[in-house]
Amino acid sequence: VISTLTASGINVIDIGITPTPTALYIVEKLKLHGGIMVSASHNPIEWNALKLIGKGGKFLDEKSVIELNKLYDKKSSRFVKALETGTYQKIDDAIEQHIKRIVRFIDIDKIKKRNFKVACDYVNGTGLFATPKLLKALGVKEISINKEWTGKFSHIAEPSANSMKSLSDLVKKNKVDIGFTQDPDADRLAIVLNDGTIVSEEYTLALCAKYLWSVGKGDAAVNLSTSRMIDDLAKEKGYSVDRTKIGEINVSSHVVKNRLYFGGEGNGGIIVPAVSPGRDSLLGIALILELMAKENKTIKEIIEEIPKYEIVKEKLEVAKIDENSFLKNIKLKY
């Protein structure tokens, strides 16, 4: 990827192996024209591909993807002459820069005073390069599993109730304050309560929203599949929650365009444009820890204060279908 870009006359900054939110942050901070992540997120290795980042550290929107496909179909790219190749620069502290930005956004001293002890399941993903550094900066003691860079996920990588049994056991065995698990590219976050109870990843956004509305003001945006917990929390504070089409770019673009306070998705993603342009599990960890410190309560006590809704998330394999006809019929029926 790097060689092709430089051979095309494009200057490249290599930030190494980092979480996706770190890459988004660096693209925004350095005012780059774009970025490329090689990732399959929580999917199996055969799904590895190029995740394209646009200006401002946001993923490409629908219009940009259409334009990109047209350029690809033209097959008009070319390599430049030898003396016109792009430059190559390596940055080794991208994660540290990202963490510094998060730390500036929160009350680090309040967290440090609590001497938290947490359990983490990194699923052998990129979170293992960043989260320990964040926790150390926050004065938090960490006990972890699946913290090896093997290139293979230790279990189902998507953060959900079905993949968190090992983390739950770790929490109960070590009597920690909370358990955290991230997906392999660390843009999504799920938690286990201090008694080992596994809760839906929908609570991640609700907890972050509860904290953010306790220290700041403003409306929010979430996608259509997100739990109504956040609507109830917003109503308590007198704020509104806009709903967007599913897709991180739809949420983040709506937040920026309408100058909203924050946004997110019920799959464990929190977006705070003042810190980072996309879903950020590292920020989510910091916000939840500060919420616990600020309210001086256990995570279980805080969860019990949030309105409860049930949601079942299942994936079904289906035969090849005509997507347009299928969606048209769904719209007609509902």
Identify the function of each model-found stretch.
Residues 1-3, 46-55, 130-132, 187-205, ...:
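Short Gly/Thr/Asp-enriched flexible loops that form oxyanion-binding sites at enzyme active sites
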Residues 1-47, 133-192:
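N-terminal small/polar loop signature for handling phosphorylated ligands or for N-terminal nucleophile
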Residues 178, 216-334:
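Phosphate-binding and adjacent anionic-ligand microenvironments
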